[in-house]
Structures are given as C-alpha cells and as structure tokens.
Amino acid sequence: MKTLAIELRKGKRTGVIPVLLAVGVLGAAYAFVNFIVRKDTLLNLPLAQMDVLLTQLYGMIMVLNLFGIVVATCMIYNMEFKGSAVKKMYMLPVSVPAMYLCKFLILTVMFLVAIVLQNLALAQIGMTDLPDGAFEMGTLVRFAGYSFLTSMPVLSFMLLISSRFENMWVPLGIGVAGFLSGMALANSGLTLLLVHPFLIILKPAVAMSAQPDSTVALVALVETLLFLAVGLWLAKYRRYE
C-alpha cells in the first residue's frame, strides 16, 4: 500500500492521471458531437440501432484511447529515468517489481475510468436519441467491457517497453508504428495476427456488430497477463545499467 501511495503521488506529478481523465472526457464529448452532427445518417444505416451506436462512434474514441495509453505509459516511467533514479532504487528498501505492478494498476484503473466516462456518454445518447425500445443496457455494458479488455494488451505492452528505454521517444515511436501497422492489418481475418496487440485494440472499431468476439477477448487477456509477467520478471532480474 505504501508503494501504491507513492506511485499515485508520482502519477499526479507526471500528469498521467490527468491525461487519462482527459481521454475519457474527450471521448465522451466526441461521441456527443459526432452523434449530433451525423444523427440522421447514422440512424439510417442498415444496421441494428445498438450496432450503430457502439461500432460507428467507437473508431475515433479508440484512437483517443490508444494514444492516451501510449502517452501515459511513456510519461509514467519518464520520471524514473531522470537522474538515474530507477538505478538507485535497487539500493533502497523498495521493491522495483512492486513499483512496476503499482504503475500497471494505476494505469489500468485510470483507463477504466476513461472507458466508463465514454460509455456513460453513449448510454445517454442511446436512452435519449435511439428509437423507443432500441437501447439495450446489457449490450452497452458487454461492449464496454470488451473494448476495455481489447485495449489492455497495448497498455501492458507499452508499459513494458517504456520501462526498458530511458529515451521517451523510443516507446512513443514504437506506439505510433504499432498503431500504423495495426491499421494496415485491421481487416485481416487471420487469427495468427492477433499476436499483434495493436491489432486487437482495433477489433471493436472495425467490427460491424457490437457483440464481443470470444477469441479476441481470450487472446487479449492472455497477452495482457503475458506482457505484465515479462515486465515484472525484467524488473526483478534485469537491473537497469
């Protein structure tokens, strides 16, 4: 708990917490504005109303989420490399793996808050603007959980990368390259390509149905835990030089 409290204070100073809150607010605002501008067009699409609400608005929200994750994960470790602070921690009564885990938990919780804010906006749109009886809260909750889970491999992967590179531009570059390569492969049906975490986060955005894909969800969970485990192992056994 002491390590978590310290990391929370660091998170406020580095701006990680405000960044992810801003992602949630901007995503919610985008959903409102987009639906207001394109309401008639969206409601006339040959799709179920809930599919329109969730899949047609999620694309830009996903981009905001992805770059919010990339920026936040880069920022959360940037402070640790200043003055070689992370190297000195091995000589202090501080568990570096515990610090890594706390950073992961802080990012996860704050990203979950962002997802909740965005989906509250979608819920408000659904209840007020969709035809009577078309809005389904259960479908919204499932899609929200699915979009959160499919974003976690990128969060876990980017935290791992950020923890190993002192120069913040390296993980930023990897994040941008990951997004571009994911976009290029987004419409591929090859299951093998799901090893690419930046492809998984795109799956809800390119789907025409709001129903979660169980295969994608399972791979997302496995990748999240795998990247987390690798990051914890490196924090414990591979000291910073």
Residues of each region from the PLM?
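Terminal transmembrane helical anchor/hairpin motif
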Residues: V33-L53, L172-E241
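Secretory targeting signals
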Residues: G24-V71, L101-F165, V206-Q211, T215, ...
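Helix-loop-helix units of permease transmembrane domains in multi-pass membrane transporters
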Residues: I76-T108
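Pore- or pathway-lining transmembrane helices of multi-pass membrane proteins that form conduits
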Residues: V19-V25, F165-M183
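Aromatic- and glycine-rich beta-strand/loop motifs that create alpha-glucan
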Residues: M1-G24
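Transmembrane alpha-helical segments in integral membrane proteins
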Residues: F67-F81, S156-W169, T224-Y237
